[in-house]
């Protein structure tokens, strides 16, 4: 018994040293002292005590530590790490980090999190949304754009140019708007809610392109030359990166620029002879200025460095009408935004056309990655959020309006399973947008966060829109100007593919970049492992390596405590009874992730980049933790209504459950099962801590989605909202609002109708009978007839001529004049004889005290 007590004391001491992060010497001396004391309790404890004493001495004595631990570790890790190409290095090095680093490191600082300023719109930004963006949306008809004009109208293009839609990111000194990241996101979302084609056309110049590159890297002369024109729309930009041989592997572009002398504007100057063939370039067919990525070579050393011939990827800016440049023809990417080719053979340009001048030769890939790190966090997530919001509004309305088997389709549990998913995913998308743009508004280029935003937002959009198609069925399949969902569905592949293909982003980039940017020691360790001066590197590595070990053991201690005894109760001060349990789970999972990530990095080393499924699961864990914190912050700044809490609860339950499942998927598939089993035992000793969201929660959220709830009201502020019954969106929305107003009357009438309470075969005959028997009043009959006609119109799909070129008029047999009451043939309801046979007696007796006199049994 004393032996067990002494062992427990030693283990607890070891845990406390790491949990409370004692210094190396303090921890070692404490461990030696406790080992000696434990030996007095039970001499058998020296079985563990002696190794701990020896290890403590090694840790305290630098020479011993270097000889016994550091040198062997340095040698083994140097051999295990594969060589890294300059392109890989630049991609992984690019950008900065933000809140995602706190979550990666396993000890999120909630005070820091709470102090992040929540994004809001300035007066100017709000005015632009309410006026210019609203006007633009009124000009757009996505069906006409898709199937007739194959482009925005000339009037629309002119409006976009005149009102500065192409210069949202450009500083005011050049005539731009200088809007915040949050404002850009809101603007793009609102445009996308009306037309994805218009949104993409406005998005690209404000994302990765000449404007962004010039802002950050251009010379003063280049900025003065191009930025005012880009702002006014006098210049239309595009950027050529991808080519037939290089899509996701854009670093392998075959396009070249060779340093040589040539003729330019009548002078013999040093420049570049360029050969390029670019594909899938948005806005290329109408561009006036082209950004190009190419590989720069200097075989003759004309730039001054005779030893350097291969400079790597470089970016330059060319006028589209420059000699030898061929722009066009168009591609057809499933949506009619301008997209095409850019080609050139033996095109000579002066060196000062390199973005940033010759000093930036070879720095193009890092420039692109850093600009992409910002743009991909705004543009495609904004489009995804808009798609989610419009699907929520339209499908929620449809699910309430559309009846099958005499019941609104949204009340069937099978439908509720997917509509609840639409609701929670839309809530997540909006929350995600707020936190990501909050980070971007802080400055910096958080590459990992924006890679998460692009991947998880577009994947969420894919699920939401697919669910919407399932619910709406034939109404969403039949194309035409009435279809509110199909064109969004067609655009999914574009969002999934561009600005970082989703498979690549999840399986390689998110955790690959995350480990470089978010781990406190890994990046510096890798630099030292690959340093040419091994002796100098070893000295630095010795200190850094022990900091890393201390970090790992601290996270192990935290993960153990949280896994066995529950997560830390640390949370922001604004946390309430609803949110505190979620913060506790995040604390637990964050510590578990830090330990799991170190296990993968330490044991797999360079093989981690080939274990893409494991890397994808690590990305899932990291991202779902970030998403959960985004939802919590969004909820904290929201109205906290019962409906909003339902949305937040389902979104949080899904995010954290998905993170947990990624943990267990990784443990089950890790190649070294013993190590995975130990980490699993430390982090999840009781098995899965979370259950999937309950069916009842899904039902509640699905029912809320069919109501005009507070979250739905908020979404209306973020999209182009209208109730025009002849509009593709307004048709469903106006019908939904009409049903909201008369639903008690409608439901009572339909229930009575289902029980055979009325004579006649049609709805109109039932109305006439109910009216003439006094079961309903003339005003109610008018309301029922009007809504029924509106309801029928809302579910109609378009019809076309045989060539599918022109839509044809639709017949709505329910559009009739309200029926009158034959008072002579049918006496008032109070004296009407009730129908027999167990059916409901329908009468409205205004003289009896009955709050619900419409149906009596």
Regions of interest found by a model, annotated:
Residues 444-476, 645-659:
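Charged, glycine-rich active-site and insertion segments that engage polyanionic ligands
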Residues 10-17, 27-37, 48-205, 212, ...:
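Amphipathic, small/basic residue-rich leader segments at the start of a protein or domain
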Residues 323-348:
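Flexible, small-/acidic-enriched active-site or ligand-binding loops
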Residues 465-489, 666-677:
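A glycine-biased, small/acidic residue-tolerant capping/turn segment at secondary-structure junctions
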Residues 414-441, 466-469, 623-634:
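Loop-to-helix element that buttresses phosphate recognition and phosphoryl-transfer chemistry
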Residues 560-572, 577-845, 849-857:
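C-terminal amphipathic alpha-helical interaction region
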Residues 267-325:
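A short core secondary-structure module
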Residues 341-376, 393-410, 434, 555-580, ...:
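A glycine-rich, basic-preceded beta-loop-alpha segment at the flavin cofactor/substrate interface
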């Amino acid at each position: 018994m004393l032996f067990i007590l002494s062992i427990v004391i030693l283990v607890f001491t070891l845990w406390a040293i790491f949990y409370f992060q004692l210094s190396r010497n303090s921890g070692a001396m404490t461990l030696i002292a406790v080992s000696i004391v434990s030996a007095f309790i039970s001499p058998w404890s020296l079985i563990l005590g002696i190794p701990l004493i020896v290890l403590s001495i090694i840790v305290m004595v630098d020479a011993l530590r270097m000889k016994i631990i550091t040198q062997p570790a340095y040698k083994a890790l140097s051999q295990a790490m594969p060589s890294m190409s300059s392109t890989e290095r630049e991609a992984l090095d690019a950008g900065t980090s933000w809140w995602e680093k706190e979550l990666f490191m396993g000890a999120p600082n909630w005070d820091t999190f709470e102090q992040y300023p929540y994004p809001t719109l300035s007066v100017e930004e709000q005015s632009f949304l309410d006026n210019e963006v609203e006007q633009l949306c009124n000009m757009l008809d996505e069906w006409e754009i898709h199937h007739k004009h194959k482009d925005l109208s000339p009037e629309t293009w002119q409006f976009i140019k005149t009102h500065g839609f192409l210069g949202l990111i450009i500083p005011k000194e050049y005539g731009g708007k200088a809007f915040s990241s949050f404002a850009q996101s809101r603007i793009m979302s609102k445009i996308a809610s009306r037309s994805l084609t218009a949104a993409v056309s406005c998005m690209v110049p404000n994302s990765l392109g000449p404007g962004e590159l010039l802002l950050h890297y251009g010379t003063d002369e280049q900025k003065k030359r191009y930025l005012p024109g880009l702002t006014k729309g006098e210049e239309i930009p595009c950027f050529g990166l991808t080519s037939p041989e290089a899509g996701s592997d854009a670093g392998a572009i075959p396009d070249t620029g060779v340093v040589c002398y040539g003729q330019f504007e009548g002078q013999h100057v040093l420049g570049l002879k360029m050969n390029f063939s670019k594909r899938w370039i948005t806005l290329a067919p109408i561009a006036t200025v082209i950004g190009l990525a190419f590989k720069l070579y200097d075989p003759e050393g004309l730039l001054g460095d005779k030893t350097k011939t291969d400079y790597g990827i470089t970016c330059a800016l060319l006028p589209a009408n420059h000699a030898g440049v061929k722009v066009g023809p168009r591609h057809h990417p499933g949506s009619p935004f301008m997209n095409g080719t850019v080609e050139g053979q033996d095109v000579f340009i002066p060196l000062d056309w390199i973005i940033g001048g010759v000093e930036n030769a070879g720095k193009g890939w890092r420039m692109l990655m850093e600009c992409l790190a910002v743009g991909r966090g705004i543009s495609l997530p904004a489009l995804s959020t808009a798609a989610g919001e419009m699907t929520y509004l339209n499908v929620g309305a449809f699910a309430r309006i559309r009846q099958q088997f005499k019941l609104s389709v949204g009340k069937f549990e099978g439908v509720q399973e997917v509509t609840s998913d639409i609701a929670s995913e839309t809530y997540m998308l909006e929350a995600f947008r707020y936190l990501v743009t909050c980070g971007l508004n802080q400055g910096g280029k958080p590459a990992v966060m924006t890679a998460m935003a692009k991947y998880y937002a577009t994947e969420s959009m894919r699920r939401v829109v697919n669910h919407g198609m399932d619910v709406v069925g034939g109404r969403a399949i039949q194309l035409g100007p009435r279809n509110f969902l199909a064109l969004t569905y067609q655009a999914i592949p574009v969002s999934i593919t561009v600005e970082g293909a989703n498979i690549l982003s999840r399986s390689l980039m998110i955790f690959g970049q995350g480990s470089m940017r978010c781990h406190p020691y890994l990046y510096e360790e890798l630099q030292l492992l690959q340093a040419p001066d091994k002796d100098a590197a070893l000295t630095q590595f010795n200190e850094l390596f022990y900091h890393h070990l201390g970090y790992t053991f601290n996270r192990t201690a935290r993960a153990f405590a949280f896994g066995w005894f529950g997560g830390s109760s640390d949370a922001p001060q604004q946390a309430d009874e609803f949110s505190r349990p979620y913060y506790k789970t995040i604390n637990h999972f964050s510590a578990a992730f830090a330990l799991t990530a170190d296990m993968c990095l330490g044991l797999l080393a360079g093989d981690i980049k080939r274990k893409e499924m494991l890397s994808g699961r690590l990305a899932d864990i990291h991202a779902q933790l970030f998403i959960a914190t985004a939802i919590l912050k969004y909820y904290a700044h929201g109205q906290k209504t019962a409906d909003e809490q339902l949305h937040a609860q389902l979104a949080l339950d899904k995010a954290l459950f998905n993170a947990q499942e990624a943990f267990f998927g990784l443990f089950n598939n890790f190649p070294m099962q013993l190590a995975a089993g130990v980490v699993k035992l430390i982090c999840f000793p009781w098995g899965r801590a979370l259950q999937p969201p309950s069916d009842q929660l899904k039902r509640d959220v699905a029912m809320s989605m069919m109501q005009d709830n507070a979250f739905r009201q908020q979404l209306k502020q973020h999209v182009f909202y209208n109730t025009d019954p002849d509009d593709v969106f307004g048709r469903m929305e106006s019908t939904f609002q009409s049903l909201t107003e008369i639903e008690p009357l409608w439901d009572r009438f339909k229930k009575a109708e289902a029980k055979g309470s009325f004579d006649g075969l049609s709805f109109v005959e039932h109305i006439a009978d109910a009216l003439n028997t006094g079961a309903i009043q003339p005003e109610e009959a008018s309301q029922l007839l009007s809504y029924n006609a509106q309801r029928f119109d809302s579910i109609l799909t378009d019809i076309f001529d045989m060539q599918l070129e022109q839509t044809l008029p639709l017949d709505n047999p329910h559009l009739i004049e309200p029926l009158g009451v034959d008072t002579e043939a049918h006496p008032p309801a109070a004296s009407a004889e009730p129908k027999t046979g167990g059916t409901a007696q329908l009468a409205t007796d205004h003289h009896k005290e009955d709050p619900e006199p419409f149906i009596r049994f």
